[in-house]
Amino acid sequence: AIARRRSYYHLKDRPLVDDERVVELIDEILATMPTPYNVQSARVVLLLGDHHREMWHLVIEALREILPKERFIASRDKIDRSFASGHGTVLFYEDTAALNHLRERQPLYADNVEIWSEQSSGMLQFAMWTALEEFGYGASLQHYNSLIEYSIAERWKINPDWRLIAQMPFGEPI
């Protein structure tokens, strides 16, 4: 699966496994992924169906506000055919409250907590991507964080202590 894992930019909305199995997969990976001092600061939100498409619509609307018209049109078209057209999106977060608690518990290593958090999140993203590949899904990793973090948090009532790290749209590769 590791050798087959790559970025797929043309996806379609076809479930290759039951969505409940994807939820179970997320739970399994979160439970087994190494974290600094077992702080378990990673948080994951799975968006499917209309929620998935709505999230990518929020990205498009955020880009509309900042891009010149010709760049916006190209970006919108890319998002529509590459990300929004897929089956779902995995949102990766880090819980800043949990990380701050770790800093307080381990003051000698407080300066390393952010680095460890990034390393742990990277392992989580890689494990998720590889596992989705095992199911036959294609995926890519996106970083529209600062453009959409507030609107996503507001729309889906995301804990304000959670910091958005990445978005992983997935679907059947075309």
Each predicted region: which residue ranges?
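N-terminal amphipathic, basic helical "cap/leader" segment at the start of enzyme domains
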Residues: 1-88
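Short coil-to-beta-strand
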Residues: 84-93, 99-100
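A glycine-rich helix N-cap at a beta->alpha junction
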Residues: 64-67, 80-82, 155-174
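Small-aliphatic-rich amphipathic alpha-helix that forms the alpha element of a beta-alpha
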Residues: 28-30, 90, 96, 106-154
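A short acidic, glycine/proline-enriched capping/turn motif at secondary-structure boundaries
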Residues: 51-53, 96-99
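Short, flexible, mixed-charge acidic loops at enzyme active sites
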Residues: 58-61, 102-107
